[in-house]
């Protein structure tokens, strides 16, 4: 197709007012996607200056989307891998995109830049070795912007890569940094530089940042080279930003080119200090460099940062992000004695005249509060905003100061805060320092953990709250009412000597849900969560629960905030089954809120949009509600129509961001409903499609509802032909298990699903034994991890248990029977250094193997010769002993856990070791080291809880018997099953039984007798358990 015709189709697809025309053009574009030269033609249209800009933009978007989807198909699902771009087209695109990416208008550059990023990330260095030469050539020939633009993408590729993946960085630095240093030096010398110069300097800074983010390239350990860079960064950092040309608009001003250069320079200096400038954190070979940095640069940077911060003290301007970064550096300096000594003479001015004012309510806050309260709430609860916020950095600085240098700083800071509280109390209404009071309250809330642990403050907290915080629940100033709620929430868990104070605070927070100001209502919800968690007498809340939920949903209609949902989850958790009368209404409201959040998120198309986070929160809350009413299956029938549309939409590509949460809901619906409805069965094809196309990372999550479909809807699974679920399952498992590009770790759930089929459909899926067995054995020959080998062997065991004769026959037909059994027995015998089994570690694994091997014992001699019988018999005995020992060990651990739990219940909730120490730094710098040792001890304790020993190289088994799952073999006792199989053999072929008995040495005869005795004990126990259940079922329930 020629360029003109393609341009017409693009125009029609995007701009035609007639829907049918748009649809036809979109279909044409879909058909053209994988034709030769199509990608190249899109690029030609995008860069054609004679073409209409709207069409160029559409072409650039199509170009970007095609490259994102198809350039590197190995990153996608099996279905997408078939749609590869022709190599000749790739070559043409690589050759041309570099030329045009910096020449096109900014509107198009972002699209082409994204495309270039995808290509570089996929192709450099293997498929695009000439790229770095292109960069060097253009740097030398003064095509600086294009070269820096590409080099920035290239360096960004390796920013977060681990050591072994960072090898190309060394070459990039070696071949380009000398030129970059020369260019940077030249740019700094230019008098009255333009914004274009700022853009070039910013790009160089970002390239440097990406190159040093995780590791310092070896070239920079050359002190002459490093010093040359530092001279430039310090020069840029210390010189004032040009006044002329700064925009007046605050949003434009903070993004102005020269402020961006300043931000990146400070960013780099901070990173060098925090990552490479602390000798205690470095390896022996890097310690001299860190000592040099500490001696030559750390103090100078500190002085520069303090001088820079003084700008805001005298009324000057600094962007929020720059203030945040400057304070981060100062916070990192507090624990270093040499740095703290430099900081000390200016500390009071910094703390009381710069940091504290940043914590106070300000003009910008007031403007937002009045003009856009929704935006005020969004900024206050946005994690990304927190990263850039001067207020957050100020709170972090104060926290670090009192944590590391508390003895000299906590008393004076508390005194300062109390003075503000007292002056506020004494002042007339007109003169009250409302904003300073807000900052003081923020400080008290931020220091909550420290004050709760430190004498004499911890004994005075209740009095402080009653005197200085709780009165502001009724303040005429909205932001103080909001702050009162927030601070009250921070201290909700303290021991109130007078429960009336807790009660009053709780009711004040609940009243705050009806406040006229939106931010007060939101902060009240946030605080309520803490009060609900801390509440020992739920009767305080129970009577107002319906009204509380009403206020919740009114607020959810107004604002999208995941903290609202967290509080709701806390209430549901706390009240459990008592939420049953509200469950249906809650799910309806949450579903409605979810759709609203989703629509907002799609409309904003914003990656850090609060709507998207709140949407996830709604789904999580629905899961929490379903869990809380899991003992009431009929409720699931009522709730299903409300949440089914969510699952149907979000189990497609539309729901990739919430796929895990939706699958959790699907798991509850398929497990707890009285039966699985046909509507819920409509989710099966969506899961299958996702699994094949793009969702293999979610296979463990998909496994759960698919297991439920098969185990709880077995009849429908077996009989339905439209769609044919059996065939559908085989198709997807076959596609995944035969794909050589899929790693072992990605298909661990496949053998588990095969197990589900054969355990739940016993005697009804004979036709699937051969296909699944061939699939399993084929993958077994290629499997690399022992965990996947174990899972595949268990598929063989499950099939033997399902039908030993049929399975053994198919195995013989493959010609691999001996190979499979040899591997099985070899894996059974393998031990770890600790002496524990290396494979089949869980009780479930051992039991499956026991049942599979035992099933062979009853086969006639013609199918299973004596020599094989003896080998299997001995292996089964060993396995039964190991299984018995593991069951006994688990029972012992359960008993110990129960005793510890009972002991824990008898001890006070408040019995924690609290000596009031505040972890002070002394004259040495041991504080961080002590903390490090403590963390190492905690890490060691945590590691001790893992099932696998330290000396176990094969750590790919991430399952334990604590993963509670139900299985049809739960009702089968492996010991009884074994003894019954031997009796069948004895009855049907006495001679064969006698030969087997005579082949056993004394040890195995003793084991066999022990297992037989244990089996009889188990029969008695099983019978007793049955009688107990029958008695319990027949006992009438007393009405409450």
UniProtKB/Swiss-Prot annotation:
Gene3D superfamilies: Leucine-rich Repeat Variant (1.25.10.10). One of its GO terms (biological process) is protein import into nucleus. Pfam families: Cse1, IBN_N. It comes from the Eukaryota. InterPro entries: ARM-like, ARM-type_fold, Importin-beta_N, XPO2_central. Disruption phenotype: Early flowering and increased sensitivity to inhibition of seed germination and plant growth by exogenous ABA. The modification N-acetylmethionine is found at residue 1. Disulfide bonds: none annotated. Residues 893-931 are annotated as: Disordered. Keywords: Acetylation, Cytoplasm, Nucleus, Protein transport, Stress response, Transport. Expressed in roots, epidermal and guard cells of leaves, stems and siliques. The keyword tRNA-binding does not apply. Residues 25-103 form the Importin N-terminal domain. GO terms for molecular function: small GTPase binding. Functions probably in nuclear protein import, either by acting as autonomous nuclear transport receptor or as an adapter-like protein in association with other importin subunits. Involved in the regulation of the abscisic acid (ABA)-mediated pathway in response to cold or salt stress. Involved in UV-B responses by regulating accumulation of UV-absorbing pigments through mediation of MYB4 nuclear transport. Involved in trichome initiation by controlling GL1, GL2, GL3 and TTG1 transcription and may affect an upstream regulator of GL3 and disrupt complex function. Interacts with MYB4. This is Importin beta-like SAD2.
């Amino acid at each position: 197709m020629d360029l003109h015709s393609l341009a017409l189709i693009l125009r029609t697809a995007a701009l035609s007012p007639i829907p049918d025309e748009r649809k036809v053009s979109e279909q044409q574009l879909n058909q053209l996607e994988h034709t030769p030269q199509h990608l190249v033609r899109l690029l030609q249209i995008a860069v054609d200056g004679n073409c209409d800009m709207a069409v160029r933009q559409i072409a650039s978007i199509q170009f970007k989307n095609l490259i994102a989807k198809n350039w590197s198909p190995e990153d996608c699902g099996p279905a997408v891998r078939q749609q590869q771009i022709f190599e000749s087209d790739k070559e043409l695109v690589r050759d041309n995109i570099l030329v045009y990416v910096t020449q096109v208008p900014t509107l198009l550059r972002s699209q082409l830049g994204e495309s270039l990023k995808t290509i570089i990330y996929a192709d450099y260095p293997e498929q695009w070795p000439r790229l770095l030469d292109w960069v060097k050539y253009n740097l030398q020939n003064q095509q600086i912007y294009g070269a820096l633009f590409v080099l920035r993408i290239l360096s960004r590729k390796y920013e977060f890569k681990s050591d072994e993946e960072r090898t190309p960085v060394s070459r990039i630095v070696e071949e380009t940094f000398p030129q970059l240093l020369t260019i940077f030096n030249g740019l700094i010398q230019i008098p009255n530089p333009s914004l274009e110069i700022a853009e070039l300097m910013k790009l160089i800074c970002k390239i440097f940042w990406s190159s040093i983010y995780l590791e310092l390239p070896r070239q920079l350990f050359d002190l002459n080279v490093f010093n040359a860079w530092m001279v430039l960064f310090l020069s840029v950092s210390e010189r004032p930003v040009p006044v002329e040309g700064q925009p007046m608009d605050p949003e434009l001003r903070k993004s102005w080119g020269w402020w961006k250069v300043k931000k990146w320079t400070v960013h780099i200096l901070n990173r060098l200090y925090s990552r490479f400038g602390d000798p205690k954190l470095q390896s022996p070979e890097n310690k001299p460099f860190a000592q040099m940095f500490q001696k030559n640069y750390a103090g100078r940077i500190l002085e520069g940062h303090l001088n820079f911060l003084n700008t805001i003290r005298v009324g000057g301007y600094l962007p929020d992000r720059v203030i945040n970064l400057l304070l981060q550096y100062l916070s990192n300096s507090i624990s270093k004695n040499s740095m703290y000594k430099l900081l000390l003479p200016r500390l009071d001015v910094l703390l009381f005249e710069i940091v504290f004012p940043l914590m106070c309510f300000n003009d910008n806050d007031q403007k937002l509060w009045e003009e856009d309260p929704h935006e005020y709430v969004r900024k206050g609860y946005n994690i990304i905003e927190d990263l850039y916020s001067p207020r957050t950095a100020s709170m972090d600085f104060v926290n670090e100061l009192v944590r590391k240098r508390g003895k000299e700083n906590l008393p004076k800071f508390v005194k300062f805060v109390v003075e503000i509280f007292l002056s506020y109390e004494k002042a007339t209404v007109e003169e009250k320092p409302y904003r300073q009071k807000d900052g003081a309250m923020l400080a008290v809330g931020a220091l909550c953990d420290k004050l709760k642990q430190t004498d004499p403050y911890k004994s005075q907290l209740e009095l402080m709250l009653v005197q200085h915080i709780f009165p502001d629940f009724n303040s005429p100033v909205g932001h103080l009412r909001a702050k009162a709620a927030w601070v009250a929430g921070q201290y909700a868990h303290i021991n109130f000597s007078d429960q009336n104070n807790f009660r009053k605070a709780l009711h004040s927070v609940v009243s705050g849900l009806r406040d006229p100001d939106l931010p007060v209502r939101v902060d009240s919800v946030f605080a309520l969560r803490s009060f609900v968690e801390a509440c020992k007498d739920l009767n305080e809340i129970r009577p107002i629960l319906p009204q509380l939920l009403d206020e919740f949903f009114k607020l959810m209609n107004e604002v999208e905030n995941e903290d609202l949902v967290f509080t709701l989850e806390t209430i549901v958790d706390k009240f459990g089954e008592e939420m049953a009368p509200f469950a249906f209404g809650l799910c309806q409201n949450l579903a409605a809120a979810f759709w609203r959040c989703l629509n907002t998120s799609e409309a904003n198309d914003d990656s850090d949009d609060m709507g998207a986070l709140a949407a996830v929160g709604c789904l999580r809350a629905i899961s929490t509600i379903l869990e809380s009413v899991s003992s009431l299956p009929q409720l699931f029938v009522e709730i299903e129509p409300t949440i089914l549309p969510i699952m149907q939409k979000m189990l497609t590509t539309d729901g990739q961001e919430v796929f895990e949460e939706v699958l959790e809901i699907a798991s509850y619906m398929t497990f707890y409903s009285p039966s699985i409805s046909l509507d819920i069965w409509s989710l099966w094809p969506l899961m299958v499609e996702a699994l094949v196309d793009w969702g293999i990372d979610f296979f463990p999550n998909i496994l759960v509802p698919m297991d439920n479909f098969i185990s709880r809807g077995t009849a429908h699974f077996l009989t339905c032909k439209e769609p044919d679920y059996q065939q559908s399952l085989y198709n997807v498992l076959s596609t995944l298990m035969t794909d050589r590009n899929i790693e072992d770790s990605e298909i661990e759930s496949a053998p588990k699903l095969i197990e589900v089929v054969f355990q739940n459909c016993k005697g009804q899926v004979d036709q699937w034994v051969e296909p699944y067995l061939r699939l399993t054995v084929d993958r077994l020959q290629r499997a690399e991890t022992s965990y996947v080998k174990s899972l595949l062997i268990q598929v063989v065991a499950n099939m033997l248990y399902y039908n030993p004769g049929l399975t053994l026959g198919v195995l013989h037909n493959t010609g691999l029977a001996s190979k499979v059994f040899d591997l099985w027995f070899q894996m059974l015998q393998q031990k770890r250094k600790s002496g524990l089994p290396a494979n089949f570690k869980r009780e479930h694994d051992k039991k499956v193997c026991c049942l599979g091997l035992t099933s062979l014992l009853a086969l006639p001699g013609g199918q299973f010769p004596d020599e094989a019988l003896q080998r299997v018999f001995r292996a089964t005995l060993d396995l039964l002993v190991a299984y018995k020992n593991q069951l006994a060990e688990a029972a012992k651990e359960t008993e110990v856990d129960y005793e510890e739990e009972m002991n824990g219940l008898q001890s006070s909730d408040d019995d924690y070791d609290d000596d009031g120490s505040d972890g002070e730094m002394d004259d040495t710098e041991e504080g961080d080291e002590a903390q490090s040792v403590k963390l190492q001890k905690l890490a060691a304790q945590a590691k001790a809880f893992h099932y696998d020993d330290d000396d176990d190289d094969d750590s790919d088994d991430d399952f334990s018997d604590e993963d509670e799952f139900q299985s049809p073999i739960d009702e089968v006792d492996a010991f009884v099953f074994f003894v019954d199989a031997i009796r069948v053999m004895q009855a049907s072929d006495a001679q064969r039984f006698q030969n087997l008995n005579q082949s056993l040495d004394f040890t195995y005869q003793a084991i066999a007798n022990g297992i037989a005795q244990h089996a009889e004990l188990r029969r008695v126990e099983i019978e007793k358990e049955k009688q107990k259940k029958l008695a319990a079922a027949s006992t009438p329930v007393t009405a409450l």
